[in-house]
Amino acid sequence: MKKLVCALLVASFVICGAMAASAEWKFERKVSIVCPWGVGGGADSTLRPMANLLKNILGQEVEVVNVTGGNGVTAIEYVYKQPADGYTFMLGTQSLFMQDIQGTTSMNFKDEFIPVARLVHAVNVITASKKAMDKKGYKTFSEMRDFVKDHPFEVSVGMLTSTGLDGASLKQALEGLDILDVSYPSGSEMNSALVGGHVDLMVTGTDEIAGLIEAGDIVPLLTLAEKRMNRYPNVECSVELGINSVLGPARGIFAKKGTPQEAIDALAAAVEQAAKDPSWQEFLVQGCYDERPGFAGPAEYAKACEEDYKLLSEYLKAEGVMKKDYYAK
């Protein structure tokens, strides 16, 4: 009985200590969150509504600073030069991990930046041109695979770069299929090509093409997820077909190494509170971000980032572009 009481007391002290740690930190001036991509894009559009909610919770201005260029590297370098004082954070995705692994950063992003909180975790979807589907006669991903086996290289897939997250998703999902790769300089041009039937397939987050799907111009063929999406219950998912591909864009907040843990905990707690706000919940629905759990605190998000780093390291190594091997034995 005494052991039980002692154990309960210890647990209570641990919990209270954790709560006190975040409560000890009080933001006393403006907080900046750097977005590595431009105004109006998916990352920026995710961060701004969260920043507005954080402003009310923290009682301080929360500024979104867009620092673009270098596929996110310019923002990494910018934040790395700022003091780790708890007032400068940055938004990050797996795209930054891939830049790090390819050696385009002056430092090791994996070692010098700390996951604070995940905001959203979208589902990637392989979509098809309605015009191309009607012409070639397939209606599902399984039927498309059968078509490709009989007609090698007659199906094309658009991509921005083979060394980005979408490229990794495609390579996993289409492994073993003789499909023609077509590069596009921008997502808007690729979308237009898909709608016009000039390319057969592409992969992107559901948040970016929901409107085109609703209009009937493109058709979701495969969701890269553990289970079928509630939005598209008749669309096959990768896991049910035995395809090991569930990569989806995860957007979260990172802090420079050396940032006070109290500041990290305080911001994570504020994000968790904001994530429960009805306006944020509505944003998740409107943005198609409600199919997977979004918010994750420091420990859970760090674990997810580690898993993505391992997976993307393997992919980039196979592509021959790995410059940093964090898992070399």
Regions found by a protein language model. Give the residues of each.
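Positively charged n-region of N-terminal signal peptides that target proteins for export
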Residues: 1-4
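Bacterial N-terminal signal peptides
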Residues: 8-16
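N-terminal signal peptide c-region/cleavage motif recognized by signal peptidases
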Residues: 17-21
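N-terminal (or domain-start) structured segment
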Residues: 23-112, 154, 163, 174-203, ...
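Hinge/capping helix and adjacent helix->loop/strand transition within the periplasmic-binding protein
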Residues: 27-30, 54-56, 78-86, 101-189, ...
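An extracytoplasmic/periplasmic, membrane-proximal ligand-sensing/linker region
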Residues: 28-30, 262-329
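Beta->alpha turn/N-cap motifs
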Residues: 91-96, 162-163, 186-187, 204-209, ...
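Periplasmic-binding protein-like
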Residues: 118-125, 222-257
